Regions:
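Predominantly the structural core of cysteine protease catalytic domains
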Residues: 1-62, 69-100
Length: 100
């Protein structure tokens, strides 16, 4: 499986730092997340919530949420990579260099 959006997202995080994205936060699994890797099967793709991807491993994105340190793993969630889990690849925002 190769997702060009995911490749760009990983490359830009590596080069420039954290990237804002949108995710589907409506699932019970997302709402009650406390550890592990949130898999695609446990969340939808109807994005409704902004979060910040701060890093990644080959298996998951490291995502900072705005719901405070009491939620998730001290305010973070690990979301499965490679399958657009929770719609994470849908609305990634990162800058590109433009020549003027």
């Amino acid at each position: 499986y190769h997702d060009p959006v995911e490749s760009h997202l990983a490359r830009n995080i590596h080069t420039y730092g954290p990237i804002p994205v949108a995710v589907d936060s409506t699932s019970r699994a997302f709402d009650l997340y406390h550890d592990g890797i949130l898999q695609k099967e446990h969340c939808g793709n109807d994005v409704d919530h902004a979060v910040l991807v701060v890093g990644y491993t080959p298996e998951y994105w490291i995502v900072k949420n705005s719901w405070g340190s009491h939620w998730g793993q001290n305010g973070y969630i690990y979301i499965e990579r490679g399958r657009n889990a929770c719609g994470i690849d849908t609305y990634a925002s990162f800058a590109t260099q433009v020549s003027i």
